[in-house]
Amino acid sequence: MRKVTKMKKWQASVLVCASLVCLSACKNQSANQVDNQSGDKQGQVSSQTAKQGEVVPDFELTGVDGKTYRLSDYKGKKVYLKFWASWCSICLASLPDTDELAQEAGDDYVVLTVVSPDQKGEQSEEAFKKWYQGLDYKALPVLLDPSGQLLASYGVRSYPTQAFIDKEGRLVKTQPGFMDKVSILESLKAMN
């Protein structure tokens, strides 16, 4: 009887340790880590911090499709901004829903996603682009933030993290962790 109890305690300990490892996998290594060496790459991001209820700073980033994306281009639309990483299993599992949201976006909202090459465990820009080409997401804009400044300005500490920006460009909320499609649509609908 004691062997069974010891075995269950041992199994529970292993399960707790494995759970902690899994949870920490989607956490960043350091909240303030920014790679200053990549600052010469294309992309302009304000160093100002985005604050809830205030107009967020504009940014200009290049997407994996080669297009230039500016937040200011979407004034008058609600913006769903998703920060994610290629190594984050939760992020990868939610990409099909995010792609569907991007396909369904109309005049009311836009979907943008952001990956930061060489930041917080993400692969290099070249490696990410090559990896991403193998995926089949046609409508999903993926913007590259090689300096990590956009991550810092939105206070991203874990992946995925979502930011909801209203039609006037104000940050309504940031939401770390998984959000399903229904919850995202409800959050967008609740905004002005």
Where are these regions (language model features)?
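A short beta-strand-turn-helix
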Residues: 58-79, 103
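Hydrophobic beta-strand anchors of alpha/beta hydrolase catalytic cores
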Residues: 80-81, 111, 162
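Short, internal strand/loop/helix patches
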Residues: 128-165
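N-terminal targeting signals for export/organelle localization
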Residues: 1-58, 192
